[in-house]
Structure formats: C-alpha cells, structure tokens
Regions:
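Extended catalytic/binding region for NAD+/ADP-ribose chemistry, centered on the ART fold
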Residues: 70-80
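Catalytic centers of hydrolytic enzymes
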Residues: 29, 35, 44-67, 83-87, ...
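Hard-cation-handling environments
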Residues: 1-32, 37-39, 147, 153-164
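Short, conserved charged micro-motifs
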Residues: 41-42, 78-82
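A short linear-motif detector with a strong N-terminal bias
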Residues: 8-13, 49-52, 73-75
Length: 198
C-alpha cells in the first residue's frame, strides 16, 4: 500500500475480506484512478492509502499531476462514486462528497483543468471547496494539506504512486502487483469453539 501524503513510502498491511469486500482498517482510505483521455482502455486502478487520516467522505479531482486522470480518495464507495460522477458530468474539476451528498464542486470543463468562469467567481468556489474539505479530511501541514491532493499520482517522484496503469514504483519505474499474498481464514464454527470437539 501507499504510505504518506507528500513523500510516499511502501507499506504493508493485512486486511480482511468479507463477502468479497475489503474491510478497511482504521487510518486507511482508498485511492482510485481512472484514465480519462481515451488513449487506451485501462481498467480503473485502486490501492490502499495510509497517511491521509480518517477520510469522512470522498475527494475527487481531475487536476492531478502529471497525467490529470480522474483521482478519488475516500473510504465510502458510494461517496467516492458520487464525487467521481459529479466530475464526469461536469467535464472535470474537483468535488467533495459526504454521506450521499455533494458538499462542494468546482467545474473545470476545459480539459478537466481549466474553468471558463470569471476569476472572482472561480476563486469564491475554490475557497468554498477548500474550506469545506476540512469536513472530509483532517489536514496536518506541511505535507497533508489540500494542495497535496493534486500530487498523489505524481509517478515521477520516489516511492509508490497509483496511476491509470497500476501501482508504480517511482524509483524503479516499474508497475508493481500490490497483492503479495492471499490466505483464507475459516469462519469459526461451533466445532472450532469447543475445545473438546463435541
């Protein structure tokens, strides 16, 4: 998994899967990346993210260096989908979702990175989004800050970064399989709970 907000490191964690759904440990979130430029048929990528605190909702952006793909951070799949779909509908930008509602949204319909709004209105919307982002994330300067969102996928930096092609190692420039081992733990049964085996 990816550890850290600005300077990332490789991490290892054991997670449980129940009914096909990964149970996120406390302090972990998901990062999801979708290729949005139509250059290849990449499957959306997802990885565990540690070091962003307890995200209470989702943060989505298409302003994400260097590839500017659609990136979503969060713990709740519904909020993540809501934020992502808001950006898809508006042609890009940034969005915050929490408990099934969009808290704030800045549309950037020009290449997913620029707005055609007057500067004063764009500044007002962006200030609102930045201020409301503290309802979703616990910011801890200097590294875990709102601006760090746009660099979460900057694969030219050292350490692990999720891209539209997969989890990459910034040092080796290789795509890495994030799943190292998988084992099944049987559910407890009455027989397993009785030391006599009766």
């Amino acid at each position: 998994h990816i550890r850290g907000a600005r300077f990332t490191q490789w991490g290892e964690v054991e997670v449980q899967v129940r009914d096909g759904i990964v149970q996120l440990p406390a302090g972990f979130s998901l990062i999801w990346v979708k290729h949005r430029h139509g250059r290849h048929q990449a499957t959306p990528q997802i990885a565990l993210l540690e070091g962003w605190g307890e995200l209470r909702g989702a943060i989505a952006t298409s302003y994400s260096h260097d590839s500017h793909n659609l990136v979503v951070l969060g713990r709740d799949a519904n909020d993540m989908a809501l934020a992502a779909n808001q950006l898809i509908a508006s042609g890009g930008g940034m969005a915050l979702a929490q408990q099934g509602e969009i808290l704030s949204h800045v549309a950037m319909p020009i290449a997913g990175m620029l707005s055609d709004l007057p500067a004063a209105e764009l500044a007002r919307q962006f200030r609102e989004l930045r201020d409301l982002s503290s309802q979703v994330a616990d910011w801890e300067p200097p590294y875990r800050v709102f601006k760090a969102i746009e660099g979460t996928c900057l694969a030219c930096n050292a350490g692990p970064h999720l891209t539209d092609l997969g989890l990459t190692d910034g040092g080796s420039r290789q795509i890495v399989d994030p799943l190292i081992a998988c084992r099944e733990i049987p559910e407890p049964t009455d027989h397993n709970n009785n030391p006599q085996g009766a």
